[in-house]
Amino acid sequence: SDVCSSDLEVIDTSNWKPFAISDLFDVVKGSRLTKADMREGTIPYIGASSFNNGITTYISNTEQLHPANTLTVCYNGSDIGRTFYQTEPYWATDDVNVLYPKFEMNEDLAMFFAPVIKCVGGLHEYGDKWKLEDMKKDVIKLPVKDDGTPDFMFMESYIQKIKKAATERISILRNI
């Protein structure tokens, strides 16, 4: 197999249907924590960053933690729309909105949703911000089953194909 070839088919999105973000997620604003109140620790502190899964430091403050298996979305600054899947409890700054899934989410589904949400967020201007109410109303298009509900199985299998292809490419590169 050639390291540059792609085993992934182009997705036909013509039959995808629109869903308001708030139909799929409860959207909650993060909380301000001043440097003076910040205590060093091991809890991820998620901010307006496009690096390191949004983690800007680690703290021990526990008053405003969000659970694992949620998404964080930067709504402010140059990284508007940047979306990350959080795998452990964390504190989200007030530059970040937290998306609590209204469905059974796993890492593969989160990896599907993150770039879809980022694309919508990228439509907002830097000075405008992606306000909480706008984020709730904004629409993402998703693959659907015959009954019109999101096709989560398709989303999971697509991400699994991407992971498999990436693993195979890494294996090829290791053997060069």
What are these regions (language model features)?
Residues 102-105, 144-148:
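A generic structural motif
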Residues 8-14, 18-22, 107, 111, ...:
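The feature marks the first
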Residues 1-31, 36-52, 145-176:
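Non-catalytic DNA-recognition/assembly elements of restriction-modification systems
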Residues 37-38, 63, 129-132:
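A short beta-turn/loop motif at secondary-structure boundaries
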Residues 84-87, 124-128:
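Catalytic micro-motifs at enzyme active sites that drive phosphoryl/nucleotidyl and oxygen chemistry
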Residues 56-115:
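A short beta-sheet element
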Residues 90-96, 127-146:
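A short glycine-rich beta-alpha junction/loop motif
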Residues 40-42, 67, 134:
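Short acidic/glycine-enriched loop/turn segments that link adjacent beta-strands
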